[in-house]
Amino acid sequence: MRDSFINTLLEYGGISSLQARLLKFLTGIQKNLNQDALNLFALLLAKQSDGDTRISIEEAPLRKAISRKMQNLGIADFDQFSESIVNGASSIKQGAYGNIVDSAPDASSFYQKPFILQNGFLYPSKYYFAKVIVEDKVKEFFNHIPSDESEIPQCIRTIESITRGPQGGGITLEKEQALAVIRGRQENLIITGGPGTGKTTVTFFLLRELYLNSEKHLQAPLYLAAPSGKAADRMKESIEQSVNLIGADEFETNLVIYNKMSNADSYTLHRLLGYKPDDNKFIYNSENHFPENSVFVIDESSMIDLTLFANFLQALPHSARIFLLGDAHQLPSVDAGAVLGELLESKADSTVKLTVSRRFNENSAIGHLAKLDFSEAPCTFVPPNEWDMHSEVQLLNLDTREKSAQLQGILEKWAGEYLDSFVELAAQVVPNQPSQEELLERVWNFCTQARILSAERSGPAGVQNINDAIERLLLSKAKGANISKIIMLNRNQSSFKLYNGDTGILFTNGNGEKFILFKTNRGFVFYPEYQFAPNVLETAFAITIHKAQGSEYDHVLMFIPTRPEHPLLNRQILYTGITRAKRSVTIVATPETFKAACETVIERDTGIEL
């Protein structure tokens, strides 16, 4: 039975086929490698999908890790696997596999063994060395320098005097925002806050303050970056919008500064570092740094994984200025490691926390729900047939015995409210015809005002099934006519300056030719569908909550799993979905799974010590 553990992990999606081949490769390097130790290595690889970069080889925490992983995968009978893995840990403690496990790691060594054992924890080598780099570099770059808080009132008055807000007056910063501007003059910062707290706006004025006081940084490059191209472009657009709020006199006085910020390029972190896929290396690295005094603004820092962050930090010159922006409560990175969480926990003195949201009031129904605190007012669920779509917050109790029928009813109601008008209006669009800008804007607004989010990709309430159901609903109403549909890119299309996560609308003209509409900084652009590989486009009436990070919609319908011990039931996934909504959010769950999600926090074991 012991040798079936790896096959079981493969069957349940705990490891990939590539990871299984890696495990087989280990037996060629270490001839005496037994099945028990191989199962331990398999568990370590499987834990990476949970974001962990190490496991303890001490019996009690190891058994706990095994149990948690098996429950997450839905594997009920795993006692025989536990005994095998614990036995494997004992053999590794005794130093039995020196060809593949290094207990005295040296980053400069020509040959790196696949695994490292340190202080009772087993790491894949790449994560161990990334951890060491992050520990060293964070201590180098993030050191608190006390600021004079008495400057806050003057900072607020200055910003008010040089700006012209939408209502005619100047922009008034909150005290916490002004403090960030003052602190950024002399220290690197982690700026965290929820949606609408003004992280990018604060950074804009922070950069102005830095450049007014440091000619050497003004003369050096400014880099705007994020893990995704979509997030990076959105930050650049926000910076450009902030420039437009500057008064004429101030703009002329500090023209060089505002031109610098307006003209700064945006990058994905991979493109910023100069990723070379042929040899899986970066142009900028520990031996080839960015220019001295460069300034970096990195948005969506919660989505940065451990190894990418290590590569970024070791490419920086000592004179660099760094500002990391992110929301600590959002979902962490897809890949292993939770960089922002580690920094906020260990570097509180280098952190500015923005708490005042202008997207929604914290005392509003959505604002209260986002706190996920029901100690004073317990949440109330209603059956789907009592759903009030115009309520700001609704919790629908999905009866698992009638799941299919209730799900169909929910989707029919949603489509009738938000998608029927979209399809009717989109039918008036003629791809590539001039003089229909106003129509395109109206269609686009319908497309982006509401979205279905799901924690899962597959399953009855996963995005694949929901998209299929919505498409069938709309086609049945169209009586055989072609319908337009919302799509999303799942891969960067650099030649078009389109990115993974960008939303578009698929249209069909009178000749049956298909075109995709995207909204770019050049306005609306139609692209023939044939210019995209088929597997690059996904239907996106519904998208995963993870894909929705950084987006906002007026109305959100969110599905979370109905299996009580599902690994995607956690506070971060709830918070991320809820805070995408501006006007209303409906959550479809069971009271039990909603409670489980509220009480579960994603905790990643990386071993980082700062």
Regions found by a protein language model. Give the residues of each.
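Pre-Walker A segment
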Residues: L117-G194, F204, L210
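ASCE P-loop NTPase helicase motor core
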Residues: A178-V181, R185-E392
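Interdomain "pre-motor" coupling segment immediately N-terminal to P-loop NTPase/helicase cores
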Residues: I75-P153
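Conserved helicase motor core of P-loop NTPases
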Residues: H329-I487, Q493-F496
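Short mixed-charge
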Residues: N72-A76, Q80, V243-N263, E424-R442
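C-terminal accessory regions
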Residues: D502-N511, F515-L610
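Intrinsically disordered, low-complexity N-terminal extensions of AAA+/P-loop NTPases
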Residues: M1-A76
